[in-house]
Amino acid sequence: MSMFLDTAKISVQAGRGGDGMVAFRREKYVPNGGPWGGDGGKGGSVIFRVDEGLRTLMDFRYNRKFKAKSGEKGMTKGMHGRGAEDLIVFVPQGTTVRDAETGKVITDLVEHGQEVVIAKGGRGGRGNIRFATPRNPAPEIAENGEPGEERQLELELKILADVGLVGFPSVGKSTLLSVVSSAKPKIGAYHFTTIVPNLGMVRTKSGDSFAMADLPGLIEGASQGIGLGTQFLRHIERTRVILHVIDMSASEGRDPYEDYVSINNELETYNLRLMERPQIIVANKMDMPEAQENLKAFKKKLAAQYDEFDDLPMIFPISSLAHQGLENLLEATAELLAKTDEFLLYDEADLVDEEAYYGFAETEKDFEITRDDDATWVLSGEKLERLFVMTNMERDESIMKFARQLRGMGVDEALRERGAKDGDPVRIGKFEFEFVD
């Protein structure tokens, strides 16, 4: 089984905030001794951190649930509960994080040490010392801790490489990478010897350096899933320059120009933006018989597809095995990289709106009202539900406070407008109570 994994589905859950405490101190002439209950500690957040030492998402094959710890409860003497530590989850460079429900991109992690809060820990509930007022100097009110965020995520790794080698199987991509870098890809005289991407650092004689990726061979229909399909096409997306390697000896019995057209069609079908990347045509195996004649025919067919004044793609005849023509190829690649900016990987439409994602959207509705088949009024909404779960329903004062909050939000008035009558059942989550008009 391959130890390379570039996709994963996981769930993350931040820690719940600790509950606030109801407590009183003993003090003469102070009702109930005065409030003394402290706040709960914050729940731990789930944070993704980039580790450049990781190369795959293999760690997520069997470990798919990540849960941060909850904060401690508030204590007497007004002391706060201890906040929980954040849970750090390490991911490789080039990891894209998507919301599994919407498919939107939450973040794209590309820099070593980069950190992003993926699920925010809940805040601690306030203790009764926070609710003391001149009218109520000894409140029996404390909040429950806020639940931590919970999310279903899709992770996708797209390796970071400046240059990507593409081409049919057995055209010499792995050999080229092994010759120009210290990478040691598997090389064999059969198709799909390379079944995972290989990455190597290339340094030219003039001192320029860049990362080069050897990607598994493509065949016609790859964008529809034939062969290794689109499994590794995603890794081309981060490259700025594509080296299109072609077996100019036609040792497999295919026409080199037809190979060139087929691979470009697959790239275009998979992602139209891949064709925006500049290409250098690498005419490999030029030390083989008939390679020179095939190259002449290739150039003629290629020129026929361009207007007289168009710039044709650069073509570099090489032999990876014989180490011929490599210096010129690498220097030209470095020069092309120097004048090629990074390509936008995601449009704004692909990205999660941060304000909406973290619950700060101005358009967020406080509540919604629906009616079940059993005639029960059902209240829902992120803000309302957050207030509800933080209310200690075991204490009368907390319940009365929650009722005042509902009135302040306009829930009572909205229920009346919808036709609610005195005594009608109303439900929030699993909690049910009667409407009082």
Curated annotation (Swiss-Prot):
Residues 359-437 form the OCT domain. GO terms for biological process: ribosome biogenesis. It comes from the Bacteria. It is found in: Cytoplasm. Mg(2+) binds at S174, T194. Residues 2-160 form the Obg domain. Keywords: Cytoplasm, GTP-binding, Hydrolase, Magnesium, Metal-binding, Nucleotide-binding. GO terms for molecular function: GTP binding; GTPase activity; magnesium ion binding. Its cofactor is Mg(2+). GTP binds at residues 167-174, 192-196, 214-217, 284-287, 319-321. Its EC number is 3.6.5.-. It is an enzyme of class 3 (hydrolase). Residues 161-338 form the OBG-type G domain. GO terms for cellular component: cytoplasm. Belongs to the TRAFAC class OBG-HflX-like GTPase superfamily. OBG GTPase family. Monomer. PANTHER family: DEVELOPMENTALLY REGULATED GTP-BINDING PROTEIN-RELATED (PTHR11702), MITOCHONDRIAL RIBOSOME-ASSOCIATED GTPASE 2 (PTHR11702:SF31). An essential GTPase which binds GTP, GDP and possibly (p)ppGpp with moderate affinity, with high nucleotide exchange rates and a fairly low GTP hydrolysis rate. Plays a role in control of the cell cycle, stress response, ribosome biogenesis and in those bacteria that undergo differentiation, in morphogenesis control. This is GTPase Obg. The gene is obg.
